[in-house]
Amino acid sequence: FREVMAKIGIHIKREDILEPMATGSLIWDRVIPASIADRDEKIRQCMELIPQIYKEVFKSVRPFPGLEPVLMRLEEKGVCLGVLTASRTIAVQPLHHHSLIRYFRVIMTREEGFPNKPAPDGVLECLKRMEILPNQAITIGDTPLDIRAGKAAGTLTVGVLSGIGSSAQLQAEEPTAIIERVSDLLSLFDLE
């Protein structure tokens, strides 16, 4: 996103986009001030650039260290996995590129048209497609929105600190558990 903004002449810090991404507030309000005369045009330019730049950015995305062994172990134990993201379909490209897509039974992106998190609709549809009841599921995420959506859907929730949300933001949502990194899932559920 910072690269997109730079292309239209606006330079922002990483922190400027983390809070809106974590909380669901409008990112445009944070990064393109209302005082800019051609604000609507700048937003339009960004919307055109995002798919082009993201396509290149996602080519360089690498999985978190230790992710594949975790996915392998979960698969061995019969755990059904799904992905629900507010991002575009291109955001799951790294799962294909690194041959991790095979571990996920369901992949849902914003193009499916469900209300954004914290609404539970996407979580519930993901569970429906996997034929899992909410009380048998765990929503794992790195933002307060993920935790709220999981709770609203009736699942247990796990906050992961290796992503966007801060420890304070995740703790404020009172998830079932908080872990430092995805690889901690195995010890959390005694699957080591």
Language-model features, listed with the residues they occupy:
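Asp-based, Mg2+/Mn2+-dependent phosphohydrolase catalytic module
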Residues: 6, 72-75, 79, 88-89, ...
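Glycine- and other small-residue-rich loops at beta-strand/loop junctions that grip anionic moieties
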Residues: 59, 84, 159
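Residue-level marker of regulatory loop/turn positions in helix-turn-helix DNA-binding domains and
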Residues: 63, 84, 115
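N-terminal helical cap/lid subdomain that shapes the substrate entry/recognition surface
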Residues: 1-68, 72-73, 77, 93
